[in-house]
Amino acid sequence: MRPILLPDPPSLSTGVPDIFEQGGSHNVVRRAVVIGNGFPGSENQCIGLVRALGLSDNHLLYRVTRPKGGLNEWLHWLPVGFHKKLDFILRHIYLYSRLMLGSKQSKYISSVPSENGGNVGLASILEADVKGIVNLARQTYEKDGPLIVIACGRDTISIASSIRRLASENVFVVQIQHPRSHLNRFDMVITPRHDYYPLTLEAQEQVPRFMRSWITPREPPQDHVVLTTGALHQIDYASLRKAASAWHDEFAALPKPLVVVNIGWPRSNCRYGADLAKQLTDSLLNVLATCGSVRITLSYKTPAKVSRVIFKELGDNPKVYIWNGQEPNPYMGHLAWGDAFVVTADSVSLISEACSTGKPVYVVGADHCKWKIAEFQKSLRERGVVRSFTGFEDMSESWSYPPLNDTAEAATRIRRELAARGWSLRS
């Protein structure tokens, strides 16, 4: 079988050197700064947007990281700045107690070994430095043009907003995911449409009246808010074509149709356990006759009680391959070569990426979801992008839909806003 050939992404090049772009070279955006929080799901959205803007070869990644170990695992609800100060105090108390008590270890606070055998403290944390990024934007503006700053996640909000406040003439700051309040701190906010579900009458009826003022967001989206259907990501024509080539030898000979199953993990708004795992395996066994082969991947956060059921029910089936986490991750190969996808309802990212292929996507466990995640599932079903996985499907049946294209659409909106400033992205 020949490798899958996907069309090249449309070229945006005009063939005009940067220096001749509108406004001169200092108005051409050539680089980006990504501010991440250390979580792949958040940073993947930033990198995907950088890629869609054509800046993947010229960006810097900064991270806002929290102290870890001991009591710190219970303090992630605190603002990151206060958390670090508290960690500093606790560590000094701990060190003082060790001096006073000799080698006797504290029962409540433990020192955390790092990879090189040292201890994790404030000095070893790679920080997103507001002052450093602001100086970079200001001092290199005339030579290298404006700086796009893209951040995602709650811990990055204060960093990104401070950069815009201090260098508004030199930067364009994009915050991915709803920052909950004071959206005017950013040049653009990109967030899923279901983040505004709390404003609907249906949602209001689910919340006691005395709590409604605490639920965010509290007002409709402003003009600089870009609403997406799902999550941003790095999946595009070029990445799928590259993956199709890279995984050709492993996947080309597999019996068709190739059904890919992606399993996430329970969330606060989508709880499940072994019961859903058993429902999934029963349904897969039901449709196995119409499958050529089945390949399953589990997240590193998938609960053991879920993975045990998957391995017990399907581990010995000759048609089924379950990724064990030890071999190279086949996820991109699955997206490129899969003929249909079955995805657990909890993960907006996994579903969004599968729905960017235009291939059949079936969702299992949507009835376990509530609040915003349930609204996300509903919107996809209404658009005909996903179907519920019942176990009575003919998996050889092919159907399609206009693929989700949120990342490219968000990038187009950024280009428009830059143009309104007299700025442009490099060709």
Swiss-Prot record:
Domain of life: Eukaryota
GO biological process, one term: protein localization to organelle
Gene Ontology, cellular component aspect: cytosol; mitochondrial outer membrane
Pfam families (UniProt xref): Mito_fiss_Elm1 (PF06258)
Annotated localization: Mitochondrion outer membrane
Main location as per UniProt: mitochondrion
Knockout mutant characteristics: Reduced plant growth and early bolting. Elongated mitochondria and reduction of the number of mitochondria per cell.
Alphabetized UniProt keyword annotations: Membrane, Mitochondrion, Mitochondrion outer membrane
SUPFAM superfamilies for the chain: UDP-Glycosyltransferase/glycogen phosphorylase
Record membrane topology: Peripheral membrane protein
Bilayer-spanning residue ranges: none
Presence of the UniProt keyword Mitochondrion in the record: yes
Signal peptide feature range: none
InterPro entries: Elm1-like
Subunit structure: Interacts with DRP3 and DRP3B.
Functional summary from the UniProt entry: Plant-specific factor involved in mitochondria fission. Is required for the correct localization of DRP3A from the cytosol to mitochondrial fission sites. Does not seem to be required for peroxisomal division.
PANTHER family noted in UniProt: MITOCHONDRIAL FISSION PROTEIN ELM1, OS02G0535700 PROTEIN
Protein's name according to its UniProt entry: Mitochondrial fission protein ELM1
Source organism: Arabidopsis thaliana
Record lineage: Eukaryota, Viridiplantae, Streptophyta, Embryophyta, Tracheophyta
